[in-house]
Structures are given as C-alpha cells and as structure tokens.
C-alpha cells in the first residue's frame, strides 16, 4: 500500500536513510522519494521548495502515467545536488535480480556528477557500507566499477554525501541516494529479526502516546489509530519470529 518512502525532505537525510534501511531489511520494497512541500512561513525553512528532488527513469517519452509507474517501480534517485548512476550485474535501479543458491560476485557500476564536492560515495547493502568508491580531484565526478560479493538475499543502493554544508546547496549537507536493486538468492527471504524488533519497540511507544493523548476529535478516531497499530504490530511480530 506504500508506493515510496520520502527519504529526503526537511529532515536529516542520513538519519532518515537509517530507518529506511531497517524497513528494507524487513523485506519491504520501498523506493526512494523526495519532497519539500511549500509552507506559508518560508522564513522557517532551511531551503526553498524543491530543494530535495526525486528523479525518475520514465523512458524517452515523458508523461504523467509513465512517471508515476517509474516511481512505483523504484526507478528513482533522490538528491539536493549530486546526480547518481548505479547498476548491479547489468541490472538498473529498481530491478529484482534472481540468483541461484550459493555465492556470487556481481559487478556494480557507479557514476557521480555534482555541482558541489562530496566526501563519500558508497554502495550500501542490507544496511551496511559494502564498498567505498575513491573520490579524487575536485570530488565532483566519479565513474568506477566494483565487484560485490553476494551470498544472501537483500538489497543494494548507491549514495553520496558531504560532511558539511556546501553552497549553493541550502541544506544540511549535499546528499543523494538511489533506490535499491533487490537481490534474491535461492529461496532465501529478506528478513531481519533485529530490525523487526526495532519497529515493535517503535509501535509500543506510539501506542503509549496514542492512549495517553487527550486531543482526539472523537473516541472512534483514537480507536481507529489503535486498530492500525495492532495490525502493524502483528506484521512486525511475524517478521521478528519467536
């Protein structure tokens, strides 16, 4: 029921990404999206509307339906400056790669073009950095190939970011990330009991706040929210295992 996750907005992008990675580790396929909305009080914003953007591979003909289909298929990357290219085993972002059981070595191809320097260009797999691509010269361009060992099901993406703010990017720091490429090895599911347990604790805290809250419009509104939390808890409890 969720077409994408807003990985970039008026938040800390690395912190948001860490939560996103946990959801991906639970087996959810969640493409990256971005957005800033447009609030009336612009003085409170750290950057203008459109500061964070989602780019979608929609083919040679651009129209609204193809663009939406590209978002849902995960053919996206999000950014406030750097532009990224990423493929794994000749598969593009958003693809599902199916491999036989056993160990494999897939070639990842990465590309970076940016109008500001970045300090890190990394391939993330199952929530961990699995490759760091060297950045040379002005740290604004890169093109490289890396061999990634793959032995279990999961996901891989490319991200770039800086350690500090860099004009003219009016954000905390330059940042960009592709959506994942998903890899299935044999019949292995993508699961993480630890990450599922993290969300169970999160749901417990939300439920406590919902029960204690006194600002509900009606009792049925509160009951509906609590019902949704019960459904969510059942999903993550099944993922967490016994």
Protein language model regions, located:
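Catalytic-loop motifs flanking and including active-site residues across diverse enzymes
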Residues: 16
């Amino acid at each position: 029921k969720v077409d994408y996750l807003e990985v970039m907005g008026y938040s800390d992008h690395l912190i948001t990404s860490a939560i996103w990675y946990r959801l991906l580790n639970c087996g959810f396929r969640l493409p990256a999206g971005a957005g800033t909305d447009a609030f009336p009080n612009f003085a409170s914003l750290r950057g203008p509307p459109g500061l964070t953007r989602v780019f979608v591979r929609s083919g040679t003909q651009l129209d609204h339906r193809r663009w939406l289909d590209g978002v849902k298929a995960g053919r996206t990357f999000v950014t406030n400056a750097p532009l990224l290219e990423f493929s794994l085993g000749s598969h593009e972002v958003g693809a599902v790669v199916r491999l036989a059981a056993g160990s494999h070595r897939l070639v990842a191809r990465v590309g970076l073009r940016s109008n500001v320097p970045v300090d890190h260009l990394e391939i993330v797999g199952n929530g961990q950095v699995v490759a760091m691509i060297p950045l040379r010269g002005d740290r604004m361009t890169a093109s490289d190939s890396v061999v990634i060992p793959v032995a279990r099901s999961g996901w891989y993406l490319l991200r770039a970011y800086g350690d500090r703010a860099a004009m003219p990017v009016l954000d905390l720091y330059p940042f960009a990330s592709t959506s994942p490429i998903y890899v299935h090895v044999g019949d292995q599911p993508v699961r993480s009991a630890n990450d599922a347990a993290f969300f169970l604790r999160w749901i417990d805290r939300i439920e406590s706040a919902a029960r204690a809250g006194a600002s509900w419009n009606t009792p049925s509104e509160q009951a509906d929210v609590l019902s949704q939390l019960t459904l969510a808890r059942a999903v993550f409890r099944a993922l967490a295992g016994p």
